[in-house]
Amino acid sequence: MLNEFIAIRRDLHQIPETGYKELKTQAYLLAYISKLPNKHLEVKKWRTGILVLVKGTKPEKTIGYRTDIDALPITEETGLPFESNHVGNMHACGHDLHMSIALGVLTHFASKPAKDNLLFVFQPAEEGPGGAKPIMESEEFAAWRPDTIYGLHIAPEYKVGEIAIKPGLLFANTSELFISFKGKGGHAAYPHLANDMVVAASAFVGQMQTIISRNIDPMDSAVITIGRIHGGEIQNVIAETAFLDGTIRTLSPETMEIVWTRLKQLAKGWEEAYQCEVEFHPGSDYYQVDNEPLETEEFIRFLKEHYPESYVPARSAMTGEDFGYFLSEIKGFMFWLGVDSEYSLHHAKLNPKEEAIPFAIDVLINFLESK
């Protein structure tokens, strides 16, 4: 018999929706939650997200658990019988697993409340434009603001049954990068009468990397990645405009500030050198996931005692996750959950092993009951 929450994961996998468009997802989650014993439950909607409070038997504090619910604009290539019904969208970052795990934990505590209050946060728009900060600033969240908060993220590189975590910095600071170049177009036969923005943008890509190699302390770490370049429309016309889309990832907010300062300085020089306009366009920012040491060490001790084969010391990663905004104000942690997939996060063929779902539910229930 298929595990109930694996079946739920497959349902959710078929209806992936991007940030703040998670209407079917929200409706599915609400329909499921409405069937749970409701004596101890209170439910609030926030935009396309949901907050569920499970009232404790003798509450002294509120413990939060957050899951993200959105998908990515990726065309799925898994060939699974339950692949995406929304062509062009895919749960390629495991949020379908995240949701099914959260529902599994919620289901248990709806019937068997813990001593303290539990707040389940079903957060939209993690992949962009970023839902953590806005939901934290909402009246709905403020009314039930937790004293601690936890979360997880699937990890294809770890085996099922493994949990990787570390105190301190787990995920990097991340900023989306969108740059436009505007010059003067013209006929390919008369380059001296135009300002070629393909040339300007291409040169800028290379020059950006000197920020990493020459402006960042070599004992620190930062990455600038340009994932998309677009310029011009026709092969025999010099491009009047060009666009660069990418990301910046750093291990500290201070290093992020250095990168941005140097980028803007370079842009001013480019405007002079290439007789063009260079403009930066706003994107999403993700604050570092910095695990609170005492909370994290408590979880590690729990794993070593109850799941001794599961604990794996994690390394800091350049991954971006807006759960960091929660941890910037509320103590807690995030951990990697092994799902043993040959394809990486954000890959069109990502196929996590579903056995990780009941395992994670079991770990979280036992940990929360131990609090």
UniProtKB/Swiss-Prot annotation:
Pathway(s) annotated for this protein in UniProt: Amino-acid biosynthesis; L-lysine biosynthesis via DAP pathway; LL-2,6-diaminopimelate from (S)-tetrahydrodipicolinate (acetylase route): step 3/3
Residues at the catalytic site: 68, 127 (proton acceptor)
One term of GO molecular function: N-acetyldiaminopimelate deacetylase activity
Catalysed reaction, written as an equation: N-acetyl-(2S,6S)-2,6-diaminopimelate + H2O = (2S,6S)-2,6-diaminopimelate + acetate
Record flagged with keyword Amino-acid biosynthesis: yes
Name of the top EC class for this enzyme: hydrolase
SUPFAM superfamilies: Bacterial exopeptidase dimerisation domain, Zn-dependent exopeptidases
Record-listed E.C. numbers: 3.5.1.47
UniProt record, GO biological process: diaminopimelate biosynthetic process; lysine biosynthetic process via diaminopimelate
InterPro entries: AcetylDAP_deacetylase, Amidohydrolase, Bact_exopeptidase_dim_dom, Peptidase_M20, Peptidase_M20_dimer
Short name of one Pfam family: M20_dimer
Keyword annotations of the record: Amino-acid biosynthesis, Diaminopimelate biosynthesis, Hydrolase, Lysine biosynthesis
Gene3D superfamilies: 3.30.70.360, Zn peptidases (3.40.630.10)
Stated family: Belongs to the peptidase M20A family. N-acetyldiaminopimelate deacetylase subfamily.
Record's function text: Catalyzes the conversion of N-acetyl-diaminopimelate to diaminopimelate and acetate.
Name of the featured protein: N-acetyldiaminopimelate deacetylase
Species of provenance: Listeria welshimeri serovar 6b (strain ATCC 35897 / DSM 20650 / CCUG 15529 / CIP 8149 / NCTC 11857 / SLCC 5334 / V8)
